Amino acid sequence: MITMIRRFIRLDAAAGMMLMMATVLAIALANWSVTAAGYQQFLMIPVEMRFGALEINKNLLLWINDALMAIFFLLIGLEVKRELVEGTLASRQQAMLPLAAAVGGMVFPALLFLLFNANDDVTRAGWAIPAATDIAFAIGVLTLLGKRVPAGLKVFLLALAIIDDLGAILIIALFYTQQVFWPALAGAVLAIAVLAYMNKLQVGKTSAYLLVGGVLWVCILKCGVHATLAGVIVGFFIPLRTSDGEPSPATSLEHGLQTWVAFLIVPLFAFANAGIVLQGIVLEKLFSPLSLGIAAGLLLGKPLGITLFSWLTIRLGYARLPVGVHFNQIVAVSVLCGIGFTMSIFITLLAFSGGDAELITYAKLGILLASGLAALLGYLALRGVLPALDKAV
């Protein structure tokens, strides 16, 4: 288990660097006169998929957001299942602290966002934007402090971020679903029933789950629910153990996907969605309720919610601090959780999918600026509270 955590942290640290480079490249290409048109044209390339009478025709940007991100969510589903069954969330005592912290870290940012946007029917739809944490960026910053970071603090951040991702998935399913097409939903329910039956029989063929998962993805896409949720559902049904003692299908797939997700899918998502055209940006609009609500949620709501809910959970005796971790380190890492980026941008695209492109631009700017500031402040806070290297646990 410790080996898996270390591998995960190394991957996410490198992925954080890749994300940063992809973001900078996207902004540069979108704003350089020589490449700006080509960048937009590249994302608008039509890609068509046909299977008999079934036809799915989308541009490259939507394929990245709907199809490739489903693989990202498949990995999240596998990680959440592993942690729930045999990892840091497997027992009540282990799970309570990161669970409470994650809930506080979602509720407070949403409330702060609504304080700024409660009276605007359009921007109010973005209430969940600051509720997410980008695990790759957060872990990337944490690893800059090397061996000074206690193992318990790393596990706490990983568990918190995984629960946070699960919360974001539930929010997407419950609040960002368009009008439902019932025949396609019936097909999705049937596909889920097949997955459940395969899991009950402990079918060990990963390819069988992925094949049914492909059908589920198409059904969910057609029924109006966001198609990326298919990835999470498939991840939950792939078994961790098989009756014949073969290697775990879920663990094998998780290891196989981690590198592709970390170094291709998530950076490609950032490259496709972070290319904000800065020409015409009005400074005053950076201080609009939308941008301020996002910034307040990420920079204030995240640390306040995580810190308060963690303190209450420990105070009431429902949880204990991890071994070698002090509460001021929990406070410092809560600032780091204000890095929203990938999931925040993803929710932005859902919240304003039928609205003004200008709203999306200023929401993305708010996310990028607040996430960058959270990374800097979180690093400085951790640097101040972590023990010197010769005293590190």
UniProtKB/Swiss-Prot annotation:
The chain crosses the membrane at residues 14-34, 60-80, 96-116, 125-145, 155-175, 179-199, 218-238, 263-283, 292-312, 330-350, 362-382. Keywords: Antiport, Cell inner membrane, Cell membrane, Ion transport, Membrane, Sodium, Sodium transport, Transmembrane, Transmembrane helix, Transport. It catalyses: Na(+)(in) + 2 H(+)(out) = Na(+)(out) + 2 H(+)(in). It is a multi-pass membrane protein. GO terms for molecular function: sodium:proton antiporter activity. It is found in: Cell inner membrane. GO terms for cellular component: plasma membrane. InterPro entries: Na/H_antiporter_dom_sf, NhaA. One of its GO terms (biological process) is regulation of pH. It comes from the Bacteria. Signal peptide: none annotated. Belongs to the NhaA Na(+)/H(+) (TC 2.A.33) antiporter family. PANTHER family: NA(+)_H(+) ANTIPORTER NHAA, SODIUM ION/PROTON ANTIPORTER NHAA-RELATED. Na(+)/H(+) antiporter that extrudes sodium in exchange for external protons. This is Na(+)/H(+) antiporter NhaA. It comes from Pectobacterium atrosepticum (strain SCRI 1043 / ATCC BAA-672) (Erwinia carotovora subsp. atroseptica).
